Amino acid sequence: MVDVNRFKSMQITLASPSKVRSWSYGEVKKPETINYRTLKPEREGLFDEVIFGPTKDWECACGKYKRIRYRGIVCDRCGVEVTRTKVRRERMGHIELKAPVSHIWYFKGIPSRMGLTLDMSPRALEEVIYFAAYVVIDPKDTPLEHKSIMTEREYRERLREYGYGSFVAKMGAEAIQDLLKQVDLEKEIAELKEELKTATGQKRVKAIRRLDVLDAFYKSGNKPEWMILNILPVIPPDLRPMLQLDGGRFASSDLNDLYRRVINRNNRLARLLELNAPGIIVQNEKRMLQEAVDALIDNGRRGRPITGPGSRPLKSLSHMLKGKQGRFRQNLLGKRVDFSGRSVIAVGPTLKMYQCGVPREMAIELFKPFVMREIVARDIVQNVKAAKRLVERGDERIWDILEEVIKEHPVLLNRAPTLHRLGIQAFEPVLIDGKALRLHPLVCEAYNADFDGDQMAIHVPLSEEAQAEARILMLAAEHILNPKDGKPVVTPSQDMVLGNYYLTMEEAGREGEGMVFKDRDEAVMAYRNGYVHLHSRVGIATDSLNKPWTEEQRHKVLLTTVGKILFNDIMPEGLPYLQEPNNANLTEGVPAKYFLPLGGDIKEAISNLELNPPFKKKNLGNIIAEIFKRFRTTETSALLDRMKNLGYHHSTLAGLTVGIADIPVVDDKTEIIEESHKRVEQITKQFRRGMITDDERYNAVTAEWRAAREKLEKRLIANQDPKNPIVMMMDSGARGNISNFSQLAGMRGLMAAPNGRIMELPILSNFREGLSVLEMFFSTHGARKGMTDTALKTADSGYLTRRLVDVAQDVIIREDDCGTDRGLLIRSIAEGKEMIESLEERLNGRYTKKTVKHPETGAVIIGPNELITEDKAREIVNAGVEEVTIRSVFTCNTRHGVCRHCYGINLATGDAVEVGEAVGTIAAQSIGEPGTQLTMRTFHTGGVASNTDITQGLPRVQEIFEARNPKGEAVITEVKGQVTAIEEDASTRTKKVFVKGETGEGEYVVPFTARMRVEVGGQVARGAALTEGSIQPKRLLAVRDVLSVETYLLGEVQKVYRSQGVEIGDKHIEVMVRQMIRKVRVMDPGDTDLLMGTLMDINDFTDANKDVLIAGGVPATGRPVLMGITKASLETNSFLSAASFQETTRVLTDAAIRGKKDHLLGLKENVIIGKIIPAGTGMARYRNLEPHAVNEEEYLNPTVEEEGNEETTEVVVDTAVETVEETVE
């Protein structure tokens, strides 16, 4: 076999008969499989050892030669070669077909490749192949048409008319084979090119399709007649195994049944031909042979599938490849691995951020080889076998060895579903008792894990390189930021938030208020001995706290609380003292009002200060982000652990619980409800009198009850006690929100019926009072709908992620700078008055394209090609700049990927992105992962939607990425100019909008009900929407340029996500949208050798034009094509990637005809053939590096090998598409 890492590319072609014979080790002549008595393979059968190799290692069939010393000898008695039994997975056989047979993929696929080659309809082909009609192969001197079809009866009549031998007509695949041999590719191609110059309409479309197929045959060197099989390959027996079950029965692969049918029919046909049987019998047998081969290649493609026992359709070769259970997705793209385990997870509150708890019995099994090696190395036993016995006995000595082996050996933990890269992280194992894995509470958010019975899988990286990668790139303590938005993903939650909230509360008049302490220890001692309360405001000598004070502040007393002294204790030294929960204190330090000169009146100073709110979840998130910005990962993860411990400790001390008495009662609830009842009665009266319509009545009633609920909510908020545990949980962000609170204490309010419409009868009770039976029944509708929606949308969201990953998996950072001369002009994204994404957010972490100057002073804020940091972005916006030209993925010139400058910073690390980063996959995960939140959140918003026809949530995201025609489509103008008139036409129920511009006039028909976006006299740009709704991107592309469409799609995706409160970096959406507009359709080939109407990569198109322009010819013209992500995935240059995505047979059929070469540039193709992926440390520049310990000098000045210095060989994998199993020569 070929070394997989020496591959450069892989090609798939049609197999010629001679090729199939060269693969074969012998002909399979009999349908027998295994002898039922001896259980040995039958001679010349489907499992023959002579053809396929021995069933036992180094042993021939008759047993004359045993042992490895006879390797390579062919036994003179039984004819079996003495070799490894593994060859039974590699050696193929063949069947010599007694009549040619058509290959169903080429005759039945859409479009029918055979039909296009011969210019015959698939219907006519089918009649000929299945012996229902004759086709004229050579009319000779008769007036019959070449390739004309005639029935049996017509054929006889023509024979009588013109005489025997006056023309040649045949039926069956043999006839088609003769016709295919007659095809003169060069001549046909030339004729079609001529025809295209004049053809229009349907004729033109057909000519383009035929030209495409004929050109593919011509360029690839495949012969059209190879689509007809004269010889059928038999795949190796170990790929279609036959196993004995207990009870003497056999379980066999369906392929064996299908091969047996073919062999039986073939042998019967041979016998009939020997006997010179009547023509009709031979014909029938040939037709049956054709059907048997069809079933073997693709059962069920034509007619009824062949069924096995229990009328189950048999799985043919095509089914072995297709779908989730097919070869590609089941065995090649992901395999089950050894050194792995899974268990339930439990919380590990005492763990450090980089640790996880692994049960002892799991660890000993996972690390068995390492333990065994160490046992032998310590001379406890002499050999590995004895060491294994020692481990399996559970000897006392192994546990100490295990402790040492796992030290600094990271393991990977994974939770399904792995929606983004944080679904697999590395930890250092800590041995624990019990059987559950222990997980650090802070990484739960990244995994989306909780401890209600979730399970996780654990994997052990074995090699030194794998361990190094796990430790350096995947350690959980390093993953502070979320790759989708660059915000911290490990913020404290629940108890941790509550503890820190309680700790930083301030109260007036508690014991010890006004005391002054010389340092932290004295304050803590006073608190421990009960002299001062955590929340009491006290003074402390400023210079005793190790913080960045000014000289003036150092000699004063700081007014704070003991809780805040403890809270600031865990913060890094360089951070200001945190007294107020706001960003100003975090960045600039404590305000002056909290400092008291020595000897000042502390009681008076305290009484003049207002009470500060405590630190909530959001504040903690901001603190973590700031610390990450200043101190990076190591310090941040240490702080997070300290914050976690402090939070747990103080939420325990606070003893916050929830009792029924903690739910407050609203005194005037009855009056509020009475008032609403009266108003609803008035509304109903108005309706009965015919003053309002039913819809108006319904809207008024629901609005009234909504108002009642809000009124109660306001009362609750106004009267709430800040020390009420439920209020504290809600206010701190630990759990629950105001809506939960008002359902407990106010009223539940309006509910949705099963059809989604809001019911007019509200639930007046709250959970404290308890619901009546009817109210309880009403609430169940919403709960049930919530559950079903969640289940359905999870699947939708997962499928969206899969399509996104597929289309962008080969987008990798390939170079430092592509040197593009284009940039993207960006401004903030807004919808009406609502800001969707500010300019500051969009600028952060990108490179500028042009110099940015202050609009008033003209001073340079930032030069071209410079990285815009958070501070620079703020400076640009504060200067009043409204639009900036930046480097963007849209305008990047890098082939097969993006360059570092056009991408900007890697949001997951906050640093500039490195070459080799798989940004396509990251982008796909960042958009797909929040998909589940989208849909679920659309149902939480109550009320009647104002414009129901506009899609929202996940369906809208799918609509955008699949480039579908949107629901509620807006009418756009193709003319830039002024709206001169809007006329209403009552008869057709439409409006007409007239736009006049320099280039001409436009008249647009708009539905009567559409809401207008423009008014008479208003100016409109080309491609501007005249009505409310979504613009159809393909129509916009026809009117405007590619960049406008890309910008529009980017804005639309952001609108959906941001409206649901999900933040995603622009660059992720840019990567996906760019993949949708990578192709060009050739409109006029000029002097290039491109074909008209072909869809091709924009880079290849440019290259072809470059060559022609250099030679002084006329370049080709093309039109950019916007494709949905599914279509874009299938149109990728890699046939391996496309075939493993969807429509496997269609992709492979097409690839084989074209003789496609896969250059293995993406990730999927390399995973499929088992080669290291060309991203990250798998890029050529990191290969062949020996891992070793380095000294400091070497570490600071590394030497990196340049790309492209490895030897690679071109490997042509010539695949008979019939036997899709790869055979590499």
Curated annotation (Swiss-Prot):
Its cofactor is Mg(2+); Zn(2+). Its EC number is 2.7.7.6. It is an enzyme of class 2 (transferase). Keywords: DNA-directed RNA polymerase, Magnesium, Metal-binding, Nucleotidyltransferase, Transcription, Transferase, Zinc. GO terms for biological process: DNA-templated transcription. Mg(2+) binds at residues 450, 452, 454. It catalyses: RNA(n) + a ribonucleoside 5'-triphosphate = RNA(n+1) + diphosphate. Zn(2+) 1 binds at residues 60, 62, 75, 78. The RNAP catalytic core consists of 2 alpha, 1 beta, 1 beta' and 1 omega subunit. When a sigma factor is associated with the core the holoenzyme is formed, which can initiate transcription. This is DNA-directed RNA polymerase subunit beta'. It comes from Streptococcus pneumoniae serotype 19F (strain G54).
